[in-house]
Amino acid sequence: MTAANQNYGTGRRKSSSARVFIKPGNGNITIDQRSLDVYFGRETSRMVVRQPLELVELLDKLDLYITVKGGGISGQAGAIRHGITRALMEYDETLRPALRAAGFVTRDARRVERKKVGLHKARRRPQYSKR
């Protein structure tokens, strides 16, 4: 890929990190050398990835090349959505208010809470016996 007519955005969600390159095309979405439908088996994950493009009505006008690392399916889909949003803002700054209103610009900062000593999980306490 040439850097001449492409835009780039990095997206993160939970422990996933996605690098998104967009360039004018006909709507091909390639994730780690696989198509969107092959990479994500769940329709909900595919919908999450397409959301920013559908919002700004550029779904069939841009080609996306994406690499993603870490995390699970949901985290990767969220990271890709965040990366696409950032790349779209670099592509056309006038799209920012619409993307911001939809909540795609803000990085979802929620992380897995750590397990504490003396507890079974992060908050699950051992069963209490009164007698």
UniProtKB/Swiss-Prot annotation:
One of its GO terms (molecular function) is RNA binding. InterPro entries: Ribosomal_Su5_D2-typ_SF (IPR020568), Ribosomal_uS9 (IPR000754), Ribosomal_uS9_bac/plastid (IPR023035), Ribosomal_uS9_CS (IPR020574), Ribsml_uS5_D2-typ_fold_subgr (IPR014721). One of its GO terms (biological process) is translation. SUPFAM superfamilies: Ribosomal protein S5 domain 2-like (SSF54211). PROSITE patterns: RIBOSOMAL_S9. One of its GO terms (cellular component) is cytosolic small ribosomal subunit. Keywords: Ribonucleoprotein, Ribosomal protein. Pfam families: Ribosomal_S9. Gene3D superfamilies: 3.30.230.10. Belongs to the universal ribosomal protein uS9 family. This is Small ribosomal subunit protein uS9.
